[in-house]
Amino acid sequence: MARVKRGVTTHARHKKILKLAKGYRGRSSTCFRVAIQKVEKALRYAYRDRRAKKRNFRALWIQRINAGSRAYGLPYSRFMDGLKKAGIALDRKVLSDIAIREPDAFKSLVEKAQAALQ
């Protein structure tokens, strides 16, 4: 049986890691042992922050809706309750977009929510 030399696969693996580490400062982009640590840490941060991004955007949308609905005298929680009772099924992303870009349409939504709460 022939001897298997692993130079090709090792070189390819090192090249892959160093390509991912491109743009890092100092030895982090040139030295494999340092680069692999930095790349693994960066991938962990990326994984964590993809999940955090969803939470952050939801919180931002809620703040925008709250600000918009309070401008017309209705707090966020009562506004959302009124929308649900009125049968208006818009998600928070769309509601926040309407609150910013189309205040007149948002005002009519607030009025419908208030009417449904009565």
UniProtKB/Swiss-Prot annotation:
Keyword rRNA-binding tagged: yes
Annotated GO MF terms: rRNA binding; structural constituent of ribosome
GO cellular component: ribonucleoprotein complex; ribosome
InterPro entries: Ribosomal_bL20, RIBOSOMAL_L20_CS, Ribosomal_protein_bL20_C
Disulphide bonds in the chain: none
Keyword Ribosomal protein recorded: yes
Gene3D superfamilies named among the record's database cross-references: 6.10.160.10, Ribosomal protein L20
Pfam families per the UniProt record, alphabetical: Ribosomal_L20
GO biological process: ribosomal large subunit assembly; translation
Keywords per UniProt: Ribonucleoprotein, Ribosomal protein, RNA-binding, rRNA-binding
Similarity comment: Belongs to the bacterial ribosomal protein bL20 family.
PANTHER family, per database record: 39S RIBOSOMAL PROTEIN L20 (PTHR10986)
Annotated function: Binds directly to 23S ribosomal RNA and is necessary for the in vitro assembly process of the 50S ribosomal subunit. It is not involved in the protein synthesizing functions of that subunit.
Designated name of the protein: Large ribosomal subunit protein bL20
Species the sequence originates in: Paramagnetospirillum magneticum (strain ATCC 700264 / AMB-1) (Magnetospirillum magneticum)
